[in-house]
Amino acid sequence: MAPGEGGYRQINKALNICAFEDYLEGQQKALPSLPDVEQISPRVLRVLGQNPASHCKFTLQGTNTFVVGTGPERLIVDTGQGIPEWADLIHETLARRGITLSHVLLTHWHGDHTGGVPDLIRMYPHLSSAIYKHEPSKTQQPITDGQIFRVEGATVRAVHTPGHSSDHMCFVLEEEHGMFTGDNILGHGTSAVEHLSTWMHTLYKMQAQDCTTGYPAHGIVISNLRTKIKGELAQKLQRERQVLKALVQAKQAERARMERAKGSVTVKELVATMYGNGVGAGIRELALEPFMDEVLRKLAEDGAVAFEVRGRVKKWFAPDA
């Protein structure tokens, strides 16, 4: 397995973003370029992961590594994908600035965030006992919801935020009312998620932290995190309304011919109704249909839709009120 591989290939009933390869390649051309190393706030230094062209092009400009604090000893959030150039850049940056590391905090298990851990331990052996992750491996330390990490100039509080992955953690930088959002909220576009309902509940939890600035694992600094989270929620709720409307219309159309009809449809039929025939088969099968299935499962959990099985085929419908 290539260095850092193992994130987006395993993730994702909600949206297999690799199916949007061509779209993302075009989108990436419009992304603003970011410097390899940038002091983005008095307490936060960002180092790019040198992985902008990863196997599924979802790392945007690359995975962001954050060096946090103001003193000679600082902590680091995420470790990139295991790209040798990233390790060299980290070593040079820390040496030039006279910085040592006390803690390594990992937002989640995906390889583009954890791939650099072996390089860090190789360069700084004392970190072998200072790698922290929720649901840790045998060689890692646990992170619990509400756990506090302190270095000079920075108090970092862990917040369990599942959705993109079950072990996902965000970190609140108390002094700045900032949040390291990991992959739950990106600097550009929207994220892929494992479980839509869980992710949406997590967004409300993130919203409740009342942070103003977001430091995402991919993309630019989010200057108004409250607005960004609100927009993400609004977008997903709008999609739910569109799905419900399509199911109601299917029921109404069938009931025009048969009084007690449910108008039940398959995921494939629903995608065809909502997106038309202009979308390629690959995107339909690998992205839109799994995403639609996740939306329907969330709506079913909410009691808004139901399904029946006909001839081993699951068909969804809007129940009567």
From Swiss-Prot:
Positions of Zn(2+) 1 binding: H108, H110
Keywords: Hydrolase, Metal-binding, Zinc
CDD domains named in the record: LACTB2-like_MBL-fold (cd07722)
Applied relevance: Notoamides have been shown to exhibit antitumoral activities. Notoamides A-C show moderate cytotoxicity against HeLa and L1210 cells with IC(50) values in the range of 22-52 mg/ml, but the IC(50) value of notoamide D is greater than 100 mg/ml. Moreover, notoamide C induces G2/M-cell cycle arrest at a concentration of 6.3 mg/ml.
Catalytic site positions: D112 (proton donor/acceptor)
Record-level GO BP terms: secondary metabolite biosynthetic process
Molecular functions (GO terms): hydrolase activity; metal ion binding
Alphabetized InterPro entries for the sequence: LACTB2-like_MBL-fold (IPR047921), Metallo-B-lactamas (IPR001279), RibonucZ/Hydroxyglut_hydro (IPR036866), Sec-metab_biosynth-thioest (IPR050662), WH-like_DNA-bd_sf (IPR036388)
EC number: 3.1.-.-
SMART domains xref list: Lactamase_B
Record: residues binding Zn(2+) 2: D112, H113
Disulfide bonds: none
Functional note: Lactamase-like protein; part of the gene cluster that mediates the biosynthesis of notoamide, a fungal indole alkaloid that belongs to a family of natural products containing a characteristic bicyclo[2.2.2]diazaoctane core. The first step of notoamide biosynthesis involves coupling of L-proline and L-tryptophan by the bimodular NRPS notE, to produce cyclo-L-tryptophan-L-proline called brevianamide F.
The protein, known as: Lactamase-like protein notP
Organism: Aspergillus sp. (strain MF297-2)
